[in-house]
Amino acid sequence: MEISASMVKELRESTGAGMMDCKKALQESNGDMQKAVDILREKGLGKAAKKADRLASEGLVSVVVSENNKTATITEINSETDFVAKNATFVDLVKNTTIHVQTNSINTVEELKESSINGVKFEEYFQSQIATIGENLVVRRFETIKAAKGGIVAGYIHSNSRVGVLIGAACDSEETAAKIHDFLRNLCMHAAAMKPQVISYKEFDADFVEKEYLALKGELEKENEELVRLKKPLHKIPEFASRAQLTDDIIAKATENLKAELKKQGKPEAIWDKILPGQIDRYIADNTQLDQRLTLLGQFYVMDDKKTVEQAIADEAKKVGGKVEIVSYVRFEVGEGLEKKSEDFAAEVAAQMA
């Protein structure tokens, strides 16, 4: 297959890899863009081609949490320009839409269009707002989470109103739920900053983990080439990338290897129990870098980076004398996942509305 300059340009823009490296990857993949991305990543030559890295819209995200902290809704509405995104009328529209979605238990955009607000159909109301504001607008998405008995939800909207997060927790009692509200909101702030994609490694499938491990390995090996040149300490190449790969047998084998190393170092066996827990934690941390990048529970907590979010939750539960489990998580960032195909975003918004 002939590799065109536009294909090379597209791959280069999406991965940040060099032009010749992109051309070779496309030749090797016979023009398959996704395979070319994987080839570059395994060689440590490019980042994942994430559509979210090429934000193509303006707009706002809104979060509304009910007074009893049992229901939370998040909404994204897109505009053509950031100027309109700062317009007070548009800000009110986004908030009112979020309240309307939550109050009326609306689940889909079609349901929203057919619903009534202020005595008229929502679609009619929305079109009148477009006329007032003077730009094409689109309700891109919304989601509501609800807490079960004994549970609680929390939400956070960043100061620029472009990033919002909802988190829901199951608790053993209403008392526990009330006590962890502020902590849960801090977790929302953490997620806004650190961008986890899922709650836990348990949501990964095996093929995804294997592909990401190869990409991580390639990335570290490439960085080590530069560290050799600079005569600096090298990255240790992990055996694994996720807790999903760390079976009980693998942990047991790692523990035996650590014991053998302690024996080799001449450490008295009587103190092994004091040393091993920290070394096992270090082994797990070294071999769960994918979890640290993409999972909420696996990331190191921004409020205390000596512990993971999972550990922070366990500590908080112990502190309040209850049980806490994160069961729902939603993060919206304006425009994420929208790929800009042209400079005419008005046309793109119009296409979404059609």
From Swiss-Prot:
Domain of life: Bacteria
Keywords: Cytoplasm, Elongation factor, Protein biosynthesis
A GO CC annotation given for this chain: cytoplasm
Entry-linked PROSITE patterns: EF_TS_1 (PS01126), EF_TS_2 (PS01127)
Gene Ontology MF, one: translation elongation factor activity
Chain residue ranges for the region called Involved in Mg(2+) ion dislocation from EF-Tu: 81-84
Name of a matching Pfam family: EF_TS
Record keyword Protein transport present: no
Location of this chain's protein in the cell: Cytoplasm
Keyword Ion transport recorded: no
HAMAP family linked: EF_Ts
Protein's job: Associates with the EF-Tu.GDP complex and induces the exchange of GDP to GTP. It remains bound to the aminoacyl-tRNA.EF-Tu.GTP complex up to the GTP hydrolysis stage on the ribosome.
NCBIfam families linked: tsf (TIGR00116)
PANTHER family according to UniProt: ELONGATION FACTOR TS (PTHR11741), ELONGATION FACTOR TS, MITOCHONDRIAL (PTHR11741:SF0)
Family: Belongs to the EF-Ts family.
Record protein name field: Elongation factor Ts
Protein species of origin: Campylobacter fetus subsp. fetus (strain 82-40)
Source species taxonomy: Bacteria, Pseudomonadati, Campylobacterota, Epsilonproteobacteria, Campylobacterales
Gene name per UniProt: tsf
